[in-house]
UniProtKB/Swiss-Prot annotation:
Molecular functions (GO terms): bitter taste receptor activity; G protein-coupled receptor activity
Organism for this UniProt entry: Papio hamadryas
Protein name: Taste receptor type 2 member 41
Glycosylation sites: N152, N167
Pfam family membership, one: TAS2R
Residues exposed to the Extracellular side: 1-7, 62-88, 151-183, 256-264
Membrane topology: Multi-pass membrane protein
Role of this protein: Receptor that may play a role in the perception of bitterness and is gustducin-linked. May play a role in sensing the chemical composition of the gastrointestinal content. The activity of this receptor may stimulate alpha gustducin, mediate PLC-beta-2 activation and lead to the gating of TRPM5.
Other remarks on this protein: Most taste cells may be activated by a limited number of bitter compounds; individual taste cells can discriminate among bitter stimuli.
Highest rank taxon of the organism: Eukaryota
Length: 307
């Protein structure tokens, strides 16, 4: 890839990451301020605050890793740094996957019109479980990330004696990263992904049936209730697309199919971090509280700029 084109994609990645950092930081500041003021948060706000905080940290780690290793791509000393990045990367991505899954479950139990006794029981109990589910997700993700790091520690430690063992250690590390990590990630992340897909599919189906009934009961497409359901469906479908895109891109990224020396590395990084950067804006513009504060800040900034 030509240097100018590579610089363009690096700049695009930086802008996308900075926008995501700003959006996630905004969510954390607004909801964190409310938490400090009132001493409590609604279950939805708990999940949004936690998701925003971990995504904020994830994007900082991602930017730091990409630019550090692009500057030290020929230095072997970066391998140890790479493994510590992987520890954080696995942990943060696992946590955000779980938080997105709990967010979809909360939407499902609050909105879906399902009369099954088990669902009604879950609808009543789930909001009270949210703090413990968030804490449990963090602990489980941390333990799994440590186990993945520990299992492969001996292989990575051999980097220190690579000059005495030829290319065998390098080949072992490459085989481990290409075959073991993607399989482990697929198994681990498939659990929250399954929870997400089941809950989001139930909710989309419930909203779709309800919207269809309203349209066939003489409700116009311009009816406020119909429009609200249509907006909710669009929000959920975009949430589903971004979640699946993030899941697939991270699994593929774990294969190291596109290395840093590859011409398509920076366009691929844009795809990997696209969901983390775009989804916060979707959350902001579909949450009345966050949307209200956002427009207030925008008006203040506009007034300050004009003055």
């Amino acid at each position: 890839m030509q240097a100018a084109l590579r610089a363009f994609f690096m700049l695009l990645f930086s802008l996308l990451s900075l926008l995501g950092i700003a959006a996630n930081g905004f969510i954390v500041l607004v909801l964190g301020r409310e938490w400090l003021r009132y001493g409590r948060l609604l279950p939805l706000d708990m999940i949004l605050l936690s998701l925003g905080a971990f995504r904020f940290y994830l994007q900082l780690v991602g930017m730091g890793h990409n630019f550090y290793h692009s500057a030290h791509v020929v230095e072997r000393s970066g391998v140890l740094t790479q493994q510590f990045f992987h520890l954080h990367w696995h942990f943060l991505n696992s946590v955000t996957f779980w938080f997105c899954s709990w967010l979809s479950v909360l939407f499902c139990v609050k909105i879906a019109n399902i009369t099954h006794p088990t669902f009604l029981w879950l609808k009543w109990r789930f909001p009270g479980w949210v703090p413990w589910l968030l804490l449990g997700s963090v602990l489980i993700s941390f333990i799994i990330a440590l186990l993945l790091f520990w299992v492969n520690y001996s292989a990575y430690q051999q980097f220190l004696i690579r000059t005495f063992s030829g290319n065998m250690t390098y080949e072992w590390n490459a085989m481990t990263e290409i075959y073991y990590f993607p399989f482990a990630q697929l198994v681990i992340w498939s659990i929250p992904c399954s929870v997400f897909l089941v809950s989001i599919x139930l909710l989309i189906n419930s909203l779709r049936r309800h919207t269809w009934r309203m349209q066939h009961n003489s409700h116009s497409l311009q009816d406020p209730s119909t429009q609200a359901h249509t907006r909710a469906l669009k929000f959920l479908i975009s949430f589903l697309i971004l979640y699946v895109l993030s899941f697939l891109s991270l699994i593929i990224d774990g294969t190291k199919f596109i290395s840093m020396q590859n011409d398509f590395y920076w366009p691929w990084q844009i795809a990997v971090y696209l969901s983390v950067s775009v989804h916060p804006f979707i959350l902001i513009f579909n949450n009345l509280k966050l949307q209200s504060v956002f427009w207030q800040l925008l008006l203040l900034a506009r007034g300050f700029w004009v003055a």
